[in-house]
Amino acid sequence: LISIGGSPGYRGMQYPDALFPSGLRVLLPEDSPRVASEDEFRFGYLIRISEDAVMEGHKDGRYKATHLRYPMIYGPRQPIPCEWWVVKRILDKRSSIVLPDSGLTIITRGYAENMAEAVLLTVDQGERASGKIYNCGDDHQLTMAQWVQVIARAMNSTMEIISIPVEYATPSRDMMIGRKHSNHLHYDTYAMRSELGYKDKIPVLEAFNRTVEWYMSNPPSLNKATESNLAQHYNDEDKLIKINVEIIQKYEKLSLANAVFKHAYAHPKKPGDTKDHLGR
């Protein structure tokens, strides 16, 4: 039996302050703390007890089970079209995009064909994988800002990234699966790579190119769960960008000391010198 789930069962995935220090561990191993109760995060708790039920059946000898924790999947035919919101902005001639906290967040992603490879490796090595839980994801992970850059390059375009504090970067929520924080969700996939020999079948940059090509030929058919009010998002983005410009102008008027970093290691000029010109 191969079961497939995801990240919501990890404590802190939705509510970073459930952990100390706040936010998930980077990298995030399979044995990290999980949601403990419905009160903490009901959806995550249901994921957690579902995993437990699968593995209990394995322990009881009813079947041999392996559980795969999938990342955010991208590529053709995905029900959650996160990349589409970047593609659509470029098609709509938007020159900039609001991202939370400079778009530095890493949310583990996996190209559909690569994640299918993870399943096949599990099938082929059933005995070795039996009773195990594996995080899955592309070997090469990108920040949000990087995947915006990659998508824009694939469309022969560019897109300026406007950094807005995560609390106010609401137009980007569709791309973050509704997350209201910018903490990383960066899986540790060492077990899958070292035990089952996983490596990306399709390199990530090529995978994004294929994804863009798919969306250009097959715009997603959206439903009430996946549609987005882009007109409202664009209006909100324009307001946020205007405020951002005003703030930067205020920063530029400040007289700030430009501290020059000096490392602590001495640079003696000749043999026998005990200190250099900086007294190190």
Question: What do the PLM-derived regions correspond to, one by one?
Answer:
Residues 1-39:
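N-terminal Rossmann-like NAD(P)+-binding domain of SDR-like oxidoreductases, especially those catalyzing
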Residues 2, 66-68, 134:
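Hydrophobic/aromatic beta-strand patches that form the interior of the parallel beta-sheet core
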Residues 5, 58, 69-71, 137:
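Active-site beta-alpha turn of Rossmann-fold NAD(P)-dependent dehydrogenases/reductases
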Residues 27-67, 82:
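Active-site Tyr-X1-5-Lys
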Residues 45, 110, 139-142, 187, ...:
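Residue-level signal for the nucleotide or nucleotide-sugar donor/cofactor binding architecture
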Residues 63-87, 105:
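Flexible, glycine-rich beta-alpha linker
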Residues 87-97, 105-142, 149, 153:
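Alpha-helical substrate-binding/gating segment
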Residues 124-189, 195, 209-210, 222-225, ...:
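Mid/C-terminal beta-alpha module of Rossmann-like enzyme folds, strongest
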